[in-house]
Design a protein with these regions (language model features):
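Histidine/acidic-residue-rich catalytic or RNA/ligand-binding cores of hydrolases
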Residues: 193, 279-283, 388-397, 444-450, ...
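Glycine-enriched alpha-helix->loop->beta-strand junction motifs that scaffold or abut catalytic
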Residues: 428-435, 469-471
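Active-site microenvironment of metallo-dependent hydrolases
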Residues: 1-85, 127-144, 191, 251-263, ...
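Divalent metal-binding segments
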Residues: 42-48, 53, 57-319, 334-388, ...
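Flexible glycine/proline-rich, aromatic-decorated loop/lid segments
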Residues: 108, 432-465, 486-498
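Short acidic/histidine-rich active-site segments
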Residues: 377-387, 465-489
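Acidic (Asp/Glu)-rich catalytic clusters
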Residues: 321-328, 427-429
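Non-cysteine beta-strand/loop elements that form the S-adenosyl-L-methionine
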Residues: 330-341, 432-440
Length: 611
């Protein structure tokens, strides 16, 4: 047996034994009462009459559970928890609703979104250009003169019935007097005439920003299209020119975005930094929200260098400021990424030719990875293409060789759409994980046009990753690429369908619904060092759960994306509830700012589902 095969078997045995131990503790608790945990007093919260999907393979279902001090204490039948109900126990009758562990997005840019939440018009759920333009027209009526109307990612032209984007002519007709910016994936942006005027892009050079273009007509005037070529720098640099919120408004926006995530059943995120997120300044707001005890989503953060050529100095400074794992269960620091060095960044626009990494990538990036490894800082690295992975894995193997054959525990790769089996074997040997997202579901037609349907069928090769024992987490890459709605991603995993309805995968790359939810719970917990601590409804784990509006295990495929939460709890604390569970709801948040926000009209998923 080869070394790779032995490693894979050992990893699978470890995972299997870990799960088996967890399951056995659940059985002991359910059958024999207070065997492993000392419960002084009654349970704080009991949920009963539920259809519980525990994500525990030994005992996958239950009908009740009890919570004490923020942890699951007992899981089993209604009768198994009845003796834990006292005069001060909060009891929730789930009325046969499906209950699952709280969802965990292993790759999102939620901290950044919180700073802007309330300024953006969202097209995530819109299914036609006609409706999108109608929403834009509605915002024109209510947005003060001088303020921007912005649509910043989360949608694809493939989801529209017309199978196209709105045209600049249509946008200019609807919004002649307000500057409008439509941010499409990291491929291109659309600016109406008023926006071009405000930005003065008629007089800006075509190559204003590195590896990006301002499209000009034959007279040298900006057409309204700005293009990643292949870098999206021009797109988010343009965003930074738009008005922002006051700090108090950013705090409130962060709380509202957390509530929006709670409505969708999210209780944890692993944040991937992003453009504009310079550590530590850009994290002041989220730290303030956490410090005041106002967080309703668990957050793990990573540091993302903003300027090429300064990455090593940035990481050296940050290493002197903070350690991996520093923080608590609600907010903690994880490591570096998703960008470590700009020379190692390969972007993700499948309508364009595959970009090459910079020629000096090994010279630039190797010292940075070694610095991180020497200081036990795990990292996450954006890698889209197999060709990029082959180069970077050479560096990782060199770094691992200097560290006893290992990288810092918890090091992983983001994306991996076109990874080969050989690349997966190398990742498995290094004991790295892979965080996957439904980015490809937003670009399926572009991918097929360039690479063909056969290549699409294993983009990314999720089942191969799992068979090799590689830790895999579910995610979105929200909010400027995909929607932050986890159920679009779960639908993609469980059906193999794109946002436009293309059947991308066969059975060899499609998961069951429970497997998809496992990636979004237990799977994602690995990426913040929380494996065994959260992700399952199981004794001794953090009591994060959601009561769903529909039985996601039974509804037709087409209805999976309509799933949301009727009640969400984080650490046993109820952070969202409505309809029949309204009496358990926490106090409403102050109104979102600004007072002309699109959230008051076209709204978000809260407004879509809750009214």
């Amino acid at each position: 047996m080869g070394e790779n095969s032995k490693n894979n078997m050992q990893r699978r045995d470890f995972i299997k034994n870990t799960l088996a131990f967890g399951a056995s503790t659940l059985f002991m608790s359910s059958a024999f009462g207070r065997t492993l945990m000392n419960l002084e007093g009654d349970a704080d919260l009991v949920v009963r009459n539920a259809k519980v999907t525990t994500i525990n393979p030994k005992y996958p279902t239950a009908e009740a559970f009890a919570i004490k001090d923020g942890m699951f204490y007992r899981v089993g039948t209604n009768s198994a928890v009845s003796d834990l109900i006292g005069p001060n126990t909060k009891v929730i009758d789930a009325q046969k609703h499906r209950v699952i562990p709280g969802l965990n997005d292993s790759h999102t840019h939620g901290v950044r979104e919180g700073l802007h939440y309330g300024l953006e018009l969202r097209w995530d759920w819109v299914d036609s250009v006609e409706e999108a333009l109608a929403m834009l027209a509605e915002e024109v009526k209510h947005t003060p003169k001088g303020q921007w109307i912005r649509v910043v990612g989360g949608f694809s032209w493939e989801q529209f019935r017309e199978k196209r984007m709105p045209t600049l002519e249509e946008i200019n007709k609807v919004a002649p007097d307000h500057p409008v910016y439509i941010f499409y994936l990291y491929a291109y942006g659309m600016l109406n005439k008023k926006a071009i005027e405000v930005l003065d892009y008629d007089n800006a050079p075509i190559d204003l920003y590195h590896k990006g273009r301002i499209e000009k007509d034959k007279h040298g005037r900006a057409t309204g299209i700005i293009t990643a070529a292949p870098s999206g720098l021009i797109m988010y640099k343009t965003l930074t020119k738009l008005p922002t919120k006051s700090r108090d408004q950013q705090v409130l926006g962060t709380r509202h975005f957390m509530n929006e995530m709670n409505v969708l059943g999210l209780t944890s995120i692993s944040d991937a930094g992003g453009g504009g997120m310079q550590y530590p300044d850009a994290y002041d707001v989220i730290q303030d929200v956490h410090g005041k005890g106002l967080s309703t989503v668990r957050v793990g953060i990573h540091t993302f260098p903003q300027v090429g050529g300064r990455e090593y100095d940035d990481y050296k400074r940050w290493i002197g400021m903070i350690k991996s794992g520093q923080g608590d269960d609600m907010y903690k620091f994880i490591g570096g990424g998703e960008n470590i060095a700009w020379a190692a960044y390969d972007y993700e626009i499948f309508a364009q030719e595959r970009p090459n990494l910079e020629k000096n990538v090994k010279e630039v990036a190797t010292p940075i990875y070694k610095l991180l490894a020497e200081n036990n800082w795990p990292w996450r690295q954006h890698i889209t293409y197999n060709e990029s992975a082959e180069i970077l894995l050479d560096i990782y193997e060199e770094v691992a060789a200097g560290g006893g054959g290992k990288l810092p525990k918890g090091t992983f790769i983001d994306h991996g759409e076109t990874f080969s089996e050989r690349t997966l074997e190398r990742i498995a040997k290094l004991e790295m994980g892979i965080a996957v997202q439904n980015r490809i579901a937003y670009q399926a037609e572009d991918f097929v046009e360039r690479y063909g349907p056969a290549a699409l069928a294993q983009t990314p090769p999720i089942k191969k990753m799992l068979k090799m024992g590689i830790p895999v987490g579910g995610g979105t890459d929200a909010t400027r690429v995909s929607s932050y709605n986890p159920w679009y991603s779960i639908h993609w995993l469980a059906t193999g369908q794109s946002r436009g309805g293309r059947q991308m995968y066969g059975d060899d790359n499609i998961l069951t619904r429970e497997e998809a939810i496992r990636l979004w719970t237990v799977g994602s917990s690995w990426f913040t060092g929380d494996m065994g601590r959260k992700g399952a409804i199981q004794e001794g784990q953090l009591a994060d759960f959601t009561i769903l509006n529909q039985d996601v295990m039974e509804v037709p495929d087409a209805l999976i994306p309509r799933t949301h939460s009727k009640l969400t709890a984080v650490g046993g604390k109820i952070v969202h509830a409505y309809n029949e569970f309204q009496k358990f709801a926490p106090p409403a948040l102050p109104d979102v700012a600004p007072d002309w926000s699109p959230l008051y009209r076209t709204g978000d998923f809260r407004k879509l589902y809750l009214g």
